[in-house]
Amino acid sequence: MKSLIQPLMRAAGVCVITDGAAGNERQALALAQAMRLTPTVQRVALRAPWRWIGPAQTRGVRFAMPRAQWRALSRPWPALAIGCGRHAAVVTRALRELSKGATYAVQILDPRIDPAHFDLVIAPRHDGLAAPNVIQTMGSLHPIDDARLAAARAAFPLFAKLEQPRTVLLVGGPRRGLELDTAWMTRLIETIDRWHERDGGSVLISTSRRTPAEWRERLRGAFRHGCTCFWGGDADGANPYAGYLAYADRIIVTPDSVNMLSEACAT
């Protein structure tokens, strides 16, 4: 039976649905890739009122997005729809209902409605979501494995020449429910600077879209003993994130990103 699943899904179609947020899309694609499926990706920007109501109401959902996008999602119904995030949950629930079960709907992250509206819900354990069709994970889904780390080492060979220990700092930023201020960042910089002075080695820093501009500028020239590599965006060249993970001796992650924490643990 298992040998039939992949051919059937390839024939009938697999789609990944997100709001376009990188963290959400990365999780949904990681699941599809782990199943050795090649999905189409639909990034939905829901119109009002669906973007306010969320998955609690799916009536008229075809009007929540451009007509061409709804047609791409529903003609034919995909065999498998993988959604991640609240806006995606509107669509994955609707596909399951309107297709009369022809679409197997998988929702990643707590949809904040009864999980019974989906075939499968995958949510981190800290969300506290429990139901017969819920799989709890320790962190977030991600694509990091030995093969990807080996590929990253091959793609960033210069990192192998950096002095050890290689300390990687992955920086996000403040978000709702988590206060990270300038004083907190100052303490973090001072701690890493003391480690660097004591142990030597290299410091490699990466920031994200959520990182305040003030933090980014401070981090760029923060360490008395020098920062070996700093990446703050496309202006700094190719994103070295995968290479950082592959070569790190120790990784420090700001606590705002479950995705980055999970991927760091996978190394």
Residues of each region from the PLM?
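Alpha-helix C-terminal capping/helix-to-coil transition sites in glycosyltransferase folds
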Residues: P76-W77, H117, G243-Y247, A266
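Extreme N-terminal starter segment of soluble prokaryotic enzymes
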Residues: M9-C15
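Donor nucleotide-activated moiety binding/catalytic core segment of transferases
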Residues: R220-M260
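Conserved catalytic-core segment of nucleotide-activated headgroup transferases in glycan assembly
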Residues: P165, P174-T207
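Active-site and donor-binding regions of nucleotide-sugar-utilizing enzymes
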Residues: V16-I17, A21-Q136, H142
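A nucleotide-sugar donor-handling region in carbohydrate enzymes
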Residues: P115-D181
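Catalytic binding pocket for nucleotide-activated donors in carbohydrate/polymer assembly enzymes
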Residues: N259-T267
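Short, structured helix-loop element that forms part of the nucleotide-activated donor/catalytic region
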Residues: R210-F223
